[in-house]
Structure formats: C-alpha cells, structure tokens
C-alpha cells in the first residue's frame, strides 16, 4: 500500500456560480476531476485513488444534483479531516442573487431545488442549506463580477504548483505544400527567405544540419525577422496564458518544411524555452530528406 499524499479539492457552492469553469480549470492544472460524486462513495473512492500511481491531485464537484448531498456531505468531510493521506481544500463558489437569476434566465434552466417554481426561491433555499458548508470552506470566491476568463485566472493563481508551469508552447515547422497544421494557433510564413533547396549540396539536408542552418541565418532579413518574431511572442505569450490557455501551438512554415522553417523553429524554440515549457517538432522534415 502506497503512503503518498493526495491533494483533494472539493468544488461546491451555488448553482450557476461557475463550478463547471472551476472544474475545467483544475483539469487543465493536472487534476483528475470527477463531477457529481455522491458523498457516500467518498471513502471507497479515496482508497482507489490512494492505490493509483498516476493520480495525486483530485478535484470533485459536489452539489445539489446528488440527492443525498445534504444528508451525507458533513459526515464525509468529517471523515476526510481524520484521514492522514489526504490534504483537503473546499472551494465554495457563490454569486449575488440578482446575478444568479440573470444567469438562469440566459440559459433558460430551472433551479434544481425549484424545478417548477421560482428561480429566486430555489436560490434562497440553496443558500440557506449551504451556509454551514460555506463556513467550513477554505476558499470562497464570489463570481458576480467575473467573466469565465477571470475565474480561470483566479483558479490558476490559487492552485497551480510552483514547480510546474502549466503553460506549454509547442513550436512546429511545416511545409505549406502539405497543408497548414489544423491545430495551430499562430502561423508564420517564412517563404520570403532565401531557399537552400536551390543549392545542390543542401537540397538533401535539413535545417538541423549546420550548413543549412548557417545559410538560413546569415541573411540580414532572417535576423531582423527573428528579432521581431521573438519580441512579438515574448510580448503576447503572457496574455495568452492570462486568458486561460494551457497550450499554444505556433507553426512556422516554408515551402517543403525541410530547410528554412526547421532552422527558424529551432532558433525560436530555444529562445522561448528560456521562459516557458517548450516542445519543438518538425512535421514534414523527413518527407523529402535524402531525395
């Protein structure tokens, strides 16, 4: 039996306050997420998680959809408090009555406590029933004035670990003749640069070979472009991260994806990885190698 420590976040609170956004944010942070687990199943669930080597961060959404919620949530939490291998944090999301009513009207949903009655009556009943749980929560967030992006940013600030940057930049070279990568967020065309393909000895090589790399890099327009591109990315990447993105795919393309785009992708990747977790790949480099 393993003695590892599990981190548990219980997401709860008012219906319509943003629990789904919170769960998605924690999932992006590497949490194993379960939506609407009945409280009575918590002890068995913990034992299973404790035996897993792949799960050490868990987030559970627990709310009124669980019919036994109010009867069993308090005993389940008391049992967790006495469990030495789990560190528990309760995240309680709330919003003002006026805001919750407005959100229900926008989505045309009924309140779970008043499926055939007044939304406001359901909100008032839910708020009263959740008052004790709110009191024992370690983190309470009022989302009345928050857009989903702002809630994601708040969740990231509260829960991301210091030893892991959850924002990953993927640099990819490609050849336009084979199509633009469908998963690219940003695409840069470097076909304006001198092409080593027309030099016989370089034709079978790639941008990873020293001769090709130096040839591509020697041109003033290459250096000017790289200076501007790296500057642009260093300026914009923090804002993509702020928007809640956990991954950004940047594609750099030339004609065949063998020479220019490969060399520039290597250069840009090495510059970006000084600050961000970065993955470098060359989609089309081997298609023509040796021909």
UniProtKB/Swiss-Prot annotation:
Pfam family, one: RapZ-like_N
Superkingdom per UniProt: Bacteria
Name of the protein this chain belongs to: Nucleotide-binding protein LMHCC_0126
InterPro entries: P-loop_NTPase (IPR027417), RapZ-like (IPR005337), RapZ-like_N (IPR053930), RapZ_C (IPR053931)
Leader sequence residues: none
Binding site for ATP: 13-20
This protein's UniProt keywords: ATP-binding, GTP-binding, Nucleotide-binding
Annotated positions binding GTP: 63-66
Keyword check for RNA-binding: no
Protein purpose: Displays ATPase and GTPase activities.
Entry's Gene Ontology molecular function annotations: ATP binding; GTP binding
Family membership: Belongs to the RapZ-like family.
């Amino acid at each position: 039996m393993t003695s590892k420590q599990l981190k548990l976040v219980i997401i709860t609170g008012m219906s319509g306050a943003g629990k789904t956004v919170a769960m998605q944010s924690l999932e992006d942070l590497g949490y194993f997420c379960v939506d609407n687990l009945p409280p009575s199943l918590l002890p068995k669930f913990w034992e299973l998680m404790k035996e897993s080597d792949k799960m050490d961060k868990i987030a559970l959404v627990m709310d009124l959809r669980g019919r036994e919620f109010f009867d069993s949530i308090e005993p389940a939490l008391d049992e967790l408090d006495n469990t030495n291998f789990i560190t528990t944090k309760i995240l309680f999301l709330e919003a003002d009555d006026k805001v919750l009513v407005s959100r229900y009207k926008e989505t045309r949903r009924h309140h779970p406590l008043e499926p055939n009655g007044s939304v406001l009556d359901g909100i008032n009943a839910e708020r009263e029933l959740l008052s004790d749980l709110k009191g024992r929560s370690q983190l309470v967030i009022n989302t009345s004035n928050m857009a989903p992006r702002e809630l994601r940013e708040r969740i990231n600030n509260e829960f991301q670990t210091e030893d892991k940057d959850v924002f990953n930049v993927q640099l990819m070279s490609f050849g336009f003749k084979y199509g633009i990568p469908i998963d690219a967020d940003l695409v840069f065309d470097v076909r304006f640069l001198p092409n080593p393909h027309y030099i016989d000895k370089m034709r079978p090589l790639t941008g990873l070979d020293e001769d090709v790399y130096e040839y591509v890099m020697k041109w003033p327009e290459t250096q000017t472009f790289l200076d501007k591109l790296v500057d642009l990315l260093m300026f914009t990447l923090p804002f993509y991260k702020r928007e809640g993105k956990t991954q950004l795919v940047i594609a750099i393309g030339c004609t065949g994806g063998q020479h220019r785009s490969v060399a520039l992708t290597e250069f840009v990747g090495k510059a970006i990885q000084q600050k961000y977790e970065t993955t470098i790949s060359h989609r089309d480099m081997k298609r023509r190698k040796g021909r």
